[in-house]
Amino acid sequence: MSLLSDNIYNKQAGRDEPKFKIWRNAGLLLTYKCNAKCEFCYYNCSPQQGGLMSVDMAINAWLSLKELAGDGAPAVSKVEPKIHITGGEPFLYWEHLLEILQEAKKNNLGPVDTIETNGFWATDEKIVEEQIKLLDEFGMSRLKISCDPFHQEYVDIELVKQLASVAKELLEHDRVLVRWEKYLDKPVEMKNITADERNKFYVEALKDYPCRFTGRAADGIAELVASQTVEQIAARNCSNAFLDAKGVHIDPYGNIFSGTCSGIIIGNIAKRPLAEIWENWQPSSDKIIETLFNSGPAGLLDEAIEAGYTQSKLYAGKCHLCTSIRQFFFDKGLYKTVLGPAECYFL
């Protein structure tokens, strides 16, 4: 188990300065492939994307988190290290998902905290029952079901209702999370409507449930709610986003993203253990990360504009500006070791 003092940045920070917190949870992006192509995707997942995290990588990531946060962590933080499995859509690779859970159980890694799905596969009640029972048997703590206007463009709401109903019968209600329950009770018809009607539902959903504008979300729907000038955004840096991140996301290729900052690679678990990456992380290790840490995305503007970036009048927020500039740098082939993989950007 690592201590706060094991990190390079923390060693140099003053006693009263904020410290770089130990990552205590990790999301395993099983794949970037998804049956849907949601407008608010934090990555750029779609049926055309790929990648599949190997069983070995998933187990190594799980072990690596336990080594970093440690079984001793609860005595200090009262927070157990947690793993959740997401995507893309994990249920596209059902047998592979089961194999990961089997190996985790065999290695006594404890339960997977959450498995996420959009419910596209819940076409038969018997199949749903069988799969939920298997997930329960292999130690899944909670099932998280996506339910919102964005997903319902691609997934029949009746399938989502069937999945939620069966899951709540077989598991305790607090082990089934529907995001968002409002749209399960009162679905929004997203098919056979005009573009204006669709955009109206998007905006209403974003008002009720704020979204982070990274990945595909920064390309389309962000424009619908863009209301902040660069001057307003410039006052906010990203130091807290890095220092206070509760965990990381690890993609199918081993790339590690801090918190929810998709497309900004801070390490690769295929090359170094998570504990070693955490212990050696400091903002000065990379130019882009150092700029974001100290000045936020507005700090990248001068370089981007000089290289040909066209600044918009308004942005939906700090993450929208950041993703827009990073997309420009990515298109230019700049900062290749940090900006990636391609599945987080538009080609």
Q: What would you call each of these model-derived segments?
A:
Residues C34, C38-C41, G254, G259-C261, ...:
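Short cysteine clusters
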Residues A58-A61, L65, I100, E130-L134, ...:
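A general structural detector for well-ordered alpha-helical segments in enzyme core domains, enriched
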Residues K133-W281, Y335:
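Radical SAM enzyme [4Fe-4S]-AdoMet core and its adjacent flexible, acidic
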Residues G27, T31-C34, G254, S312-Y315:
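Residue-level signal for mature regions of secreted extracellular proteins and peptides
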Residues P18, A75, L135-D136, N240, ...:
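Structural motif
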